A protein has these predicted regions:
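Helix-turn-helix
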Residues: 1-22
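Alpha-helical structural segments
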Residues: 5, 22-42, 53, 57-60, ...
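Short, residue-level hotspots on alpha-helical faces of the histone-fold
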Residues: 26, 30, 87, 91, ...
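A short secondary-structure junction motif
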Residues: 27, 34-38, 65, 69, ...
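Solvent-exposed, amphipathic alpha-helical segments
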Residues: 34-42, 119-130
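Amphipathic alpha-helical segments that line or abut small-molecule/effector binding pockets
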Residues: 48-63, 67, 114, 118, ...
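Amphipathic alpha-helical packing segments from all-alpha helical-bundle domains
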Residues: 76-102, 107-121
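C-terminal peripheral helix-coil segments that are non-catalytic and often amphipathic
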Residues: 118, 126-159
């Protein structure tokens, strides 16, 4: 079925992939590699002062791959992919944070990280499911604002 949809013959498909699961794994690995490369060229200080710089690159990556990202992190998504994504982001954030501000108690980092990364994944899920009405740049600033200001963001929106 995939070969028909891609307008290739089955032999060509199996020349490149063992099976459908191999195809999916290669797609996932490609996305995660792009994410990791993107994160690695940012300075540790970006995490503290201007997280929107990171998100301004992340959200176009999501936008360019919206169909597959929707499948991977959607309601019936791939938990293994989500966990791999969280691990990559956690390692980068922990390394950068410890370089800037070593922690006496890593529990605080772990709790904050769990909260923020789950919120960011939720933000992507919201954006994709609502038809990506906001631009990637708008969403990047919104995400930064929430990370840096938390619930105070809603106070500004209240009448």
């Amino acid at each position: 079925e995939i070969a028909d949809m891609a307008d290739i013959n089955r032999g060509t498909f199996y020349l490149h992939y063992k099976d459908v699961f191999d195809l999916m794994e290669q797609i996932e690995n490609g996305l995660l590699k792009e994410l990791e490369d993107m994160l690695n060229h940012h300075q540790a200080q970006d995490l503290l002062s201007r997280p929107s710089l990171i998100f301004a690159e992340l959200y176009p990556l999501v936008q360019d791959n919206a169909d597959i990202v929707s499948i991977l992190i959607g309601e019936n998504g791939d938990l293994n992919f989500v966990n791999r994504l969280k691990h990559i982001v956690r390692e980068k954030c922990l390394k950068d944070w410890m370089a800037l501000k070593p922690l006496r108690n890593s529990n605080a980092f772990e709790a904050y990280y769990a909260f923020i990364v789950s919120g960011c994944i939720g933000m992507v899920q919201y954006w994709l499911s609502s038809g990506m009405k906001e631009s990637a740049e708008e969403l990047a600033y919104m995400t930064e604002n929430i990370i840096l200001n938390g619930i105070r963001v809603l106070e500004k929106e209240a009448k």
